[in-house]
Amino acid sequence: MKIIIFLIVCSFVLIGVKADNGYLLNKYTGCKIWCVINNESCNSECKLRRGNYGYCYFWKLACYCEGAPKSELWAYETNKCNGKM
């Protein structure tokens, strides 16, 4: 039984089950999903995108998501927003 559990854990490491943290990406505009103080909408949007927990990061006015796949997150390197909303 211990060997089976060990093999399962090793397979997760080899497969690369990885979740990241970051700002949610609006795939239509390429921008971050904006918010003001609405943690509930950010949390639901984060969970819809397979994240664990989301909240409105007030200083950046954008939804921050913890535990989401990288494909659902905005990245500075691939930023295509150019100020569009």
Curated annotation (Swiss-Prot):
It is found in: Secreted. PROSITE patterns: LCN_CSAB (PS51863). The keyword Amino-acid biosynthesis does not apply. InterPro entries: LCN-type_CS_alpha_beta_dom, Scorpion_toxin-like, Scorpion_toxin-like_sf, Scorpion_toxinL, Scorpion_toxinL/defensin. Keywords: Disulfide bond, Ion channel impairing toxin, Neurotoxin, Potassium channel impairing toxin, Secreted, Signal, Toxin, Voltage-gated sodium channel impairing toxin. Residues 1-19 form the signal peptide. Disulfide bonds join C31-C81, C35-C56, C42-C63, C46-C65. The keyword Zinc does not apply. GO terms for molecular function: potassium channel regulator activity; sodium channel inhibitor activity; toxin activity. CDD domains: neurotoxins_LC_scorpion (cd23106). A possible sulfoxide Met-85 on BmP09 could explain the difference of function between BmK AS-1 and BmP09. It holds the Pfam family Toxin_3. Residues 20-82 form the LCN-type CS-alpha/beta domain. Expressed by the venom gland. GO terms for cellular component: extracellular region. One of its GO terms (biological process) is defense response. Has the structural arrangement of an alpha-helix connected to antiparallel beta-sheets by disulfide bonds (CS-alpha/beta). Beta toxins bind voltage-independently at site-4 of sodium channels (Nav) and shift the voltage of activation toward more negative potentials thereby affecting sodium channel activation and promoting spontaneous and repetitive firing. BmKAs1 also significantly stimulates the binding of [3H]-ryanodine to ryanodine receptors on the sarcoplasmic reticulum of the skeletal muscle. It also displays antinociceptive effect in rat models. Belongs to the long (4 C-C) scorpion toxin superfamily. Sodium channel inhibitor family. This is Beta-toxin BmKAs1. The lineage of its organism: Eukaryota, Metazoa, Ecdysozoa, Arthropoda, Chelicerata.
